[in-house]
């Protein structure tokens, strides 16, 4: 968002932080392992100042090792996650077009399990209408189970594939333009 004089900024950073000594024995950064669970875990958090109700369901899974991110396997995993997210989010969007939708908004995504760095999760979440949490929960679980059992149609995949590839092309062009 503008031109930066790299040499000037680097000199300023060195000047500002020069007097801060490096730690002699820095603590090793450790991440707590998140355990799997056999039965669903349920948690309800309330806030009297919150104006919306949000329902989230996390389907935990192991994460891909970091050393594979920048490989063909990492690219394929990223592509598959994006296509699946696009397809299920399109289904949620269609549900919201109905006369009495089960939620105000819904979204699926795959990433870290909450703030954990050691466990991934496929997450479905919805903005819920007052008094309709059961309706929203049923819709989210039903749709994710439908995907698990039956997958997606060829036409859903074709539309999602085209959209995801367009996103990759736009990202590539943006990065190419800036470098």
Feature roles, as predicted:
Residues 2-53, 159-173:
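An aromatic/glycine/proline-enriched structural segment found at the starts
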Residues 77, 81, 85:
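Long, His/Glu/Asp-enriched segments that create or flank divalent metal/ion-associated functional microenvironments
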Residues 1, 51-72, 92-179:
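M16 family metallopeptidases and their MPP-like homologs
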